[in-house]
């Protein structure tokens, strides 16, 4: 089975072991093209991020993707935050493709847990990417149709089931050029709980994997799909987060990212600037 959920006391240590092993593999690759950064928390006016629409960093160091007004999330909010430097996902000269790992923690909280909308996603898109539509489009896509020219890959954490393009119930999904996911797995969202996410892409197998863990609940959700990023994405991309609240009254939630790290290697690629420790130091990879 390509995607599944499991609940076990040993699941979180297992996922950490897998993550550590994959990071070791990345570090052993003989590569001149790499990108690495770590934001244990965020800083207001963060210079290494591009903010679009409603996204901002709060005074407490939280990346708040959608609006909160007087403590309440409003409807029809959309926000995105992208890593500022373009990222070379594949090399047109050599044909090599980058492997990468990214991890982040987020909280989604709703005033009414029965009426959540719409969701949060991690995505890769063309360098000049601009916000998509509200609501169910998650700020990434313009409409529900498949379009190869979108050149987008996303992992979504969807809290509202749109009858036209979603499975029934809250879910995680992998999206390729469409809001209609190529793979989904049911997701038991928990109101106000910290979720830890680990996403990896292995270039040699074209394997995109994502796991979400609620440490306090010892519950995990895992999804996997084969995605040829060289066929889907342009050579250079930007990547980051997008989130939306619902269109209808009452269908709202917060979409807050607490921390974020990323590491990649592209054999024979170009060197790019990287940051560590929330921008306190920079280096050329």
From Swiss-Prot:
Amino acids binding Ca(2+): 158, 162, 166
Residues that hold Mn(2+) according to the record: 156, 158, 166, 171
PANTHER family listed in its UniProt record: CONCANAVALIN A-LIKE LECTIN FAMILY PROTEIN (PTHR32401), LECTIN (PTHR32401:SF45)
Name assigned to this protein: Seed agglutinin 1
Tissue: Expressed in seed.
InterPro entries registered for this protein in UniProt: ConA-like_dom_sf, L-lectin, Lectin_LegA_CS, Lectin_legB_Mn/Ca_BS, Legume_lectin_dom, Leguminous_Lectin
Self-association and partners: Homotetramer.
Alphabetized Pfam families for the sequence: Lectin_legB (PF00139)
Glycosylation sites: 92, 147, 188, 209
Source organism per UniProt: Robinia pseudoacacia (Black locust)
Signal sequence, renumbered to the chain: 1-31
Entry keywords, A to Z: Calcium, Glycoprotein, Lectin, Manganese, Metal-binding, Signal
Reported modifications of this chain: N-glycosylated; three of the four potential glycosylation sites are occupied.
GO molecular function, one term: carbohydrate binding
Organism ancestry: Eukaryota, Viridiplantae, Streptophyta, Embryophyta, Tracheophyta
Family: Belongs to the leguminous lectin family.
Function: Seed lectin.
């Amino acid at each position: 089975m390509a995607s599944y959920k499991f609940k076990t006391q040993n699941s979180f240590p297992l996922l950490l072991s897998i993550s550590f092993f994959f990071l070791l593999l990345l570090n052993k690759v003989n590569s001149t093209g790499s990108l690495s950064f770590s934001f244990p928390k965020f800083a207001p006016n963060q210079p290494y991020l591009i903010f679009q629409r409603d996204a901002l960093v709060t005074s407490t160091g939280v990346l708040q993707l959608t609006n909160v007004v007087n403590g309440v999330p409003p409807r029809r909010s959309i926000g995105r935050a992208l890593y500022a430097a373009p990222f070379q996902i594949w090399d047109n000269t050599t044909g090599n493709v980058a492997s990468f790992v990214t991890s982040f923690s987020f909280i989604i909280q709703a005033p009414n847990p029965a009426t959540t909308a719409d969701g949060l996603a991690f995505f890769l898109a063309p360098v000049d990417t601009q916000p998509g539509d509200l609501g169910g489009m998650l700020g990434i896509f313009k409409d529900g149709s498949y379009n190869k020219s979108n050149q987008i890959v996303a992992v979504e954490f969807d809290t509202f089931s749109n009858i036209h393009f979603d499975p029934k119930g809250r879910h995680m999904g992998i999206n390729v050029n469409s809001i209609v996911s190529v793979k989904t797995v049911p997701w038991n969202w928990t109101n106000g709980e910290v979720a830890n996410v680990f996403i990896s892409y292995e270039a040699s197998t074209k394997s995109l994997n994502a796991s979400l863990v609620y440490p306090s609940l010892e519950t995990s959700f895992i999804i996997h799909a084969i995605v040829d990023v060289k066929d889907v994405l342009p050579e250079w991309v930007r990547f980051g987060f997008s989130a939306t609240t619902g269109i209808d009254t009452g269908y709202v939630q917060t979409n807050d990212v607490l921390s974020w790290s990323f590491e990649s290697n592209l054999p024979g690629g170009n060197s790019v600037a990287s940051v560590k420790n929330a921008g306190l130091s920079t280096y050329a990879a």
